[in-house]
Amino acid sequence: MAFHSFLLEPITCHAWNKDATQIAFCPNSHDVHIYKKDGVKWTKIHELKEHNGQVTGIDWAPESNRIVTCGTDRNAYVWTLRNNVWKPTLVILRINRAARCVKWSPKENKFAVGSGSRLISICYFEQENDWWVCKHIKKPIRSTVLSLDWHPNNVLLAAGSSDFKSRIFSSYIKEVEERPAPTPWGSKMPFGELMFESSSSCGWVHSVCFSNSGDRMAWVSHDSTICIADATKKMRVTSLITDTLPLLCVTFITENSLVAAGHDCYPVLYTYDEAQGTLSFGGKLDVPKQSSQRGMTARERFQNLDKKASSDTNNITLDSLHKNSISQISVLSGGKAKCSKFCTTGLDGGMCIWDVKSLESALKDLKIK
């Protein structure tokens, strides 16, 4: 595991470029910083300044090398690299509340933005007018959309919101794509069609994620539960009440294994058994180091004041690499089918890259199916 602390400020969201040599993240501000790995060091090479409010979502398209950002200023920007300078293009989302999350579609011909306006903006480029336009998915969303994830077919879109529901919508836009083929989630997919809706849980849905095949969707909510809906099993929903603090993010690393993290400051493995229809705890993925007894330097004392609002040396040291809540997980290599590396960022301003093989060798009881 490689841990790097960029700043004292929390990292609210991040995205990687195609070859994982550059990372773009928001340090809890109006700006986006882009760092490049130079040997073992990270060097800031760009700073994207255009938003008037805090940046809440970032996604980096691997093939077109475009970055999309959204923020509390109710706008989205598509950034294009020209002559080593990132140029922004404003996208009017037609919303009256903050944008909360953004995701490029797999084919990168459209992107989705979730917002506090109780809707999802599906944005695509209109060649005739040379402009980004959007269509809205509204019903039956009743509260802020907190998370999004695309199905591999480029049409179905998973959304989690603070009305305690996770849903799957069709985002088919005939202007930019061909009619989609039937999927286990359904065959009729006009724009805005509700393909799946979970029953009410007891908490905001913080994160949603499709599996590599697209036949399963997982989500985590604020009542410390993790759930999977399996389209090949008649939309069967399997849930597990965890003994952790609420989870904030989740991703598939194989078709049957998931990694989730949140307020406990370390990632956790969960395993799905398709035959039995059960979810089980697979293990904690953070190997604690033996702490050494020593005094605190002045620098560490001020860092504790800034990160944890305390300078007390007693009972404040966490065994985990992250020292505050983990806000996002992203797959770095191998994809969701067979992930070999994944990344976590947190409110401690740190970024950690986890090697799956190293985790399996370090944790003897760990079994990733």
Swiss-Prot record:
Sorted keywords for this record are:
Actin-binding, Cytoplasm, Cytoskeleton, Nucleus, Repeat, WD repeat
What this protein is reported to do is described as: Component of the Arp2/3 complex, a multiprotein complex that mediates actin polymerization upon stimulation by nucleation-promoting factor (NPF). The Arp2/3 complex mediates the formation of branched actin networks in the cytoplasm, providing the force for cell motility. In addition to its role in the cytoplasmic cytoskeleton, the Arp2/3 complex also promotes actin polymerization in the nucleus, thereby regulating gene transcription and repair of damaged DNA.
Q: Name one GO biological process term.
A: Arp2/3 complex-mediated actin nucleation
Q: Which GO terms describe its cellular component?
A: Arp2/3 protein complex; cytoplasm; nucleus
Show the taxonomic lineage: Eukaryota, Metazoa, Chordata, Craniata, Vertebrata
Protein known as: Actin-related protein 2/3 complex subunit 1B-B
Keyword presence, rRNA processing: no
Location, primary (coarse class): cytoplasm
